[in-house]
Structure formats: structure tokens, C-alpha cells
From Swiss-Prot:
Protein name according to UniProt: Asparagine--tRNA ligase, chloroplastic/mitochondrial
Reaction(s) catalysed by this chain's protein: tRNA(Asn) + L-asparagine + ATP = L-asparaginyl-tRNA(Asn) + AMP + diphosphate + H(+)
Lineage: Eukaryota, Viridiplantae, Streptophyta, Embryophyta, Tracheophyta
Top-level EC class: ligase
HAMAP family: Asn_tRNA_synth
Keywords: Aminoacyl-tRNA synthetase, ATP-binding, Chloroplast, DNA-binding, Ligase, Mitochondrion, Nucleotide-binding, Plastid, Protein biosynthesis, Transit peptide
Origin species: Arabidopsis thaliana (Mouse-ear cress)
CDD domains: AsxRS_core (cd00776), EcAsnRS_like_N (cd04318)
Length: 567
């Protein structure tokens, strides 16, 4: 197909040679040339067309299957309409200005253009001080304006308020104050977007509970900006660790017909119920049913019940048995009606799978991973971590340094039960062999019994663990492990997977799980099965552990919890 454009007509497609990777835009607002120096890399010169021109401009045109003579046409089009896409240039960020060891002193005398949002504005006689933040770091850049600066009338008119977005040009000078080493002497300021006086986070401090109702604005605060940057660094460090260790990243599906945990706490995905833009008052009787009165899933989109995934583990195992070491990193969902500070309905999971590996290999990998990402954050997010150490959890840097440097301990589940039974402490939940450990038990072990060191508990009773975990020789326990850390409790859970077909089938039968639903998972044991192991890590709990934030709803951009799916 070839695209033909006329200034006064709509788009028309004709049956000619193919033009691929074709993009265009309309020049309709010449006043936007105010920002021309900032956008030169992507827009053609504004004076290329009359002010009222609606001519389309080709950014890129790549020909395919050109017939005889069509090459000349393309060359002609390029000369008449084409302009090359400009080079992408990274914007100068405040972190680059103030982030060095000298905190910006090496840039004194440089002319800069900074864009960001106004945090504070105060006037003193003939001088106005504006604090600007662009999200690249915790620090604001202090901008000093006098009445001779271009755009100062916007200060006098009240157009520049807290929350407004601005573009500021000026020169870096040594600061006369003591709070910062440098500041920007403003030569020109442009209000990019005004901020209404109803802006809800103008106060210096607002509660985190209030900010959860303003999740679209809370990243502009110091706390949530710092959380977002640390979360980003943890995600980057996660990929970096596994990639450097020879793992292959695998995208696991979000929609699945399998229940990895066998708990049944899944969100159903169906088209049998009217969508939001349709009549939501449709009777439940309209849902198709079988002769027996059950839902007729054969008429649903997938022809069978489908759910949002609770884990990417089973899918990860399929690739581990081909690529050896893999990991998944993506969203998972649990329809668990737990309205607590520790639970989310939607959260992210990191799930590596190691082929030709046992539980010892699994524990070693989990330990190396946690120490790597913790150290990476301490080395690369120093300003944000100092903020958390001052305002969120005093001593968090020391605590994390211990995790990064000290050896982890391991003990059996049976030994952990013995420690809890001997503890001079009253627990809310009972302690008994065969019962799962609760958060209060886990925190006692890591915080009190072992003085704040991470502890790995292994070899749990098989009755409290999932079907896929490898049965130990005693017939009562499985090769499973949980990593416990201070303040959180369980951070990582993993196991050696059951690679023996007959044992896995027997376990499915024992738990009355439908083997037909796991036919492909069983196939992995039929065709070249190998010992393999893996673990799962709730990413939000990791962010909590590293930042000291006590509520999990405050470490994910848009928390999904019971009765709450706003934004």
C-alpha cells in the first residue's frame, strides 16, 4: 500500500508499493515555537511552513517491493516532504547538576536550562527564591530571580504557584546560603503548566493515608519520589544480577488456566458477564449454562475457565528445562480478601528457575541475589537512603549493610519450632509441628532469636506446602525453604521442584487436583526431566524491606486491595 496525503483531504490508501514505518504530524500551532530550542531534535523548523499550513510531513519512509521507477518517486517525496528524525538528546536533570561529589561546584558559570515542578516559592524584597524538583533526585534546585529576569511578571501576577511546571534558563552560581552549594541565577522563566490553587499537596507534610487517596499526585512528594527511585533501582539491579549470572528472562503469561498454588484464590477472566460499557443490569440467568445448571465455559472466550496468574513459576519451569537458568519478573494476582498492611491483590514477583540444581543451590542463589540488590541500592541511591534513614526508619542503612555483608544462617523447620516453643514470649498464633509459621513467628526468629540476621528455614512439612515441591526421603517433609528478614518476616519462598513423574502424579491425586489441567507440566517429567529448583520473591516486600516503609500499599504506584481499584 502507498499513502497519499493532500492538504485538504483525508488519508487515502492506494494499491501501490508498500511504505513502511511511516509517521506524520500536523503543524497547527506556531506559538509552540516558544519551546523550539527544546524540541529541535524532533520537529522540523517552524518557519518551514506558513502559520496556517496543514501540510503533512513525513518523518520516515522506507520502501519495500518497489516497482520499476518507484525509487525515483520515493526520492522525490523525500525532497518535497521529508525531514530527518533528529538525534535523541537526554534532558539535563537536577541529579546531574547536584549529584557529583562537589554537589555542583564544578558547574559554576555554566548556562543551563532546567525543567521541573515548583516545590516552594518565597519572595524577599527584590529577590524571589523558587525551589524546583524534576524527580531525578531528592534535592531541589534553588532558583534565584530578580525583577530584571525575563518572565518575572509571572511571579508578580501569581501564575507561579506550588505545583506549577516551569522551564528555567540561567547560570549556575555558588550559593550564598548554607543549605546548598550552588543555585541557578535565573535569566528567563516560562510557565509550562499553571497549577490551580486547589492543589492538594501544597502543605509540607500530609499523611500517607491521605496520599493514598491522591495516588496520581503522591509521587511528587519526597517520600514517594524516593520510593519510586529505589523501586526502579531494585528492578534494574534484579535484571542486572540475573543477566550477569547467565539467566534468560522469560515473559510468563498473565492469563492462565492453571493454579500454581492450588489455593483457588484466583481472579476469573471471562466474557460471559457484560463489560462496563454494556448493560450491567443483565440478569445472572443470561449467563450460559449447561444442562446440569453449571456455567457453560465452552461459550466463553477461551472455551474453558481462565484466571489471572498467581505465579509464573510453572511456565518458568518449562523454559528452565530448555535454557537451564531463567527468571520471570512480572505482575501476579491473588483474590485473597486480606485488608492488611502486608497484602495486595496485584503485586510483582521475581521467580528464577535453575535447572540441574537442588535446594542448596536454590538457597545460595537467593542469598546472592538479595545481597547483590541491597548493596546496589546502598551504592547508587545514597541520598534517598539517607532520607529513609532520617525520616522513615533510623538505622536502616546499618541494617541493610549487615544483610549485604554478613553470612546467612539456615536451620530446619523442626529446629525452628523448638526455638519458638522455648521462647519466653506469648504468641497470638499457636506453635506446633505441622502448622505453618506466622509472621510473628518469623520475625521472632530473625529479629530476636538471631539478633537481626537473615535466616533461611528449610524442610517444611509437605502437608502445608504446594504440590510441586520435592518430597524428602523421610516422606513427611519437602525440600522447601523460606528466607526470613527483619521487619518483614518471609521475603523469599522457594523449593526444589518434584522432577519424578510418578511422585508428582501421586501428589496431585492426593490433593485431588485435576491432572488433565497439568498435562503439559507433567510432560516436563516425561521428556528429559532434570532436578531443578527455584524461588519466588514478592517485589513490593523487597521494596518495603529496603525503604523501611511499613505499609505495602505505599511501595507500589497504584495499590489494588479489597474494595479499592481507583486510578
Amino acid at each position: 500500500m502507498a499513502a497519499t496525503f493532500l492538504p485538504a483531504t483525508s488519508l487515502r490508501l492506494t494499491q501501490n508499493s508498500t511504505l513502511r514505518f511511516l509517521s506524520f504530524f500536523t503543524i497547527s500551532n506556531p506559538s509552540y515555537s516558544l519551546f523550539r530550542p527544546l524540541r529541535r531534535r524532533v520537529l522540523p523548523p517552524f518557519d518551514a511552513f506558513p502559520a496556517n499550513s496543514r501540510r503533512r510531513c513525513f518523518c520516515t519512509a522506507v520502501s519495500e517491493s518497489l516497482g520499476s521507477g518507484d525509487g525515483n518517486k520515493v526520492e522525490s517525496y523525500e525532497k518535497r516532504f521529508g525531514s530527518k528524525v533528529g538525534e535523541f538528546r537526554k534532558k539535563l536533570r537536577i541529579a546531574e547538576v547536584k549529584g557529583g561529589a562537589d554537589e555542583g561546584l564544578s558547574r559554576v558559570g555554566q548556562s543551563l536550562n532546567i525543567m521541573g515542578w515548583v516545590r516552594t516559592l518565597r519572595s524577599q524584597s527584590s529577590v524571589t527564591f523558587i525551589e524546583i524538583n524534576d524527580g531525578s533526585c531528592l534535592s531541589n534546585l534553588q532558583c534565584v530571580m530578580t525583577s530584571d529576569a525575563e518572565g518575572y511578571d509571572q511571579v508578580e501576577s501569581g501564575s507561579i504557584l506550588t505545583g506549577a511546571s516551569v522551564s528555567v534558563q540561567g547560570t549556575i552560581v555558588a550559593s550564598q546560603g548554607t543549605k546548598q552549594k550552588v543555585e541557578l541565577k535565573v535569566e528567563k522563566i516560562i510557565v509550562v503548566g499553571e497549577c490551580d490553587s486547589s492543589y492538594p499537596i501544597q502543605k509540607k507534610r500530609v499523611s500517607r493515608e491521605f496520599l493514598r487517596t491522591k495516588a496520581h499526585l503522591r509521587p511528587r512528594t519526597n517520600t514517594f519520589g524516593a520510593v519510586a527511585r529505589v523501586r526502579n533501582t531494585l528492578a534494574y539491579a534484579t535484571h542486572k544480577f540475573f543477566q550477569e549470572s547467565g539467566f534468560v528472562w522469560v515473559a510468563s503469561p498473565i492469563i492462565t488456566a492453571s493454579d500454581c498454588e492450588g489455593a483457588g484464590e484466583q481472579f476469573c477472566v471471562t466474557t460471559l458477564i457484560p463489560s462496563s460499557h454494556e448493560n450491567t443490569d443483565t440478569s445472572i440467568d443470561a449467563i450460559p449454562k449447561t444442562k446440569g445448571g453449571l456455567i457453560d465455559w465452552s461459550q466463553d472466550f477461551f472455551g474453558k475457565p481462565a484466571f489471572l496468574t498467581v505465579s509464573g513459576q510453572l511456565n518458568g519451569e518449562t523454559y528452565a528445562t530448555a535454557l537451564s537458568d531463567v527468571y520471570t519478573f512480572g505482575p501476579t494476582f491473588r483474590a485473597e480478601n486480606s485488608n492488611t498492611s502486608r497484602h495486595l491483590a496485584e503485586f510483582w514477583m521475581i521467580e528464577p528457575e535453575l535447572a540441574f540444581a537442588d535446594l542448596d543451590d536454590d538457597m545460595a542463589c537467593a542469598t546472592a541475589y538479595l545481597q547483590y540488590v541491597v548493596k546496589y541500592v546502598l551504592d547508587n541511591c545514597k541520598e534517598d537512603m539517607e532520607f529513609f534513614d532520617t525520616w522513615i526508619e533510623k538505622g536502616i542503612i546499618r541494617r541493610l549493610s549487615d544483610v549485604a555483608e554478613k553470612e546467612f544462617l539456615q536451620l530446619g523447620y523442626t529446629d525452628a519450632i523448638e526455638i519458638l516453643l522455648k521462647a519466653n514470649k506469648k504468641f497470638d498464633f499457636p506453635v506446633k509441628w505441622g502448622l505453618d509459621l506466622q509472621s510473628e513467628h518469623e520475625r521472632y526468629i530473625t529479629e530476636e532469636a538471631f539478633g537481626g540476621r537473615p535466616v533461611i528455614i528449610r524442610d517444611y512439612p509437605k502437608e502445608i506446602k504446594a504440590f510441586y515441591m520435592r518430597e524428602n526421603d523421610d516422606g513427611k517433609t519437602v525440600a522447601a525453604m523460606d528466607m526470613l528478614v527483619p521487619r518483614i518476616g518471609e521475603l523469599i519462598g522457594g523449593s526444589q521442584r518434584e522432577e519424578r513423574l510418578e511422585v508428582l502424579e501421586a501428589r496431585l491425586d492426593e490433593l485431588k487436583l485435576n491432572k488433565e489441567s497439568y498435562w503439559w507440566y507433567l510432560d516436563l517429567r516425561r521428556y528429559g526431566s532434570v532436578p531443578h529448583a527455584g524461588f519466588g520473591l514478592g517485589f513490593e516486600r523487597l521494596v518495603q524491606f529496603v525503604t523501611g516503609i511499613d505499609n505495602i500499599r505505599d511501595v507500589i504506584p497504584f495499590p489494588r486491595t479489597p474494595a479499592s481499584a481507583e486510578f
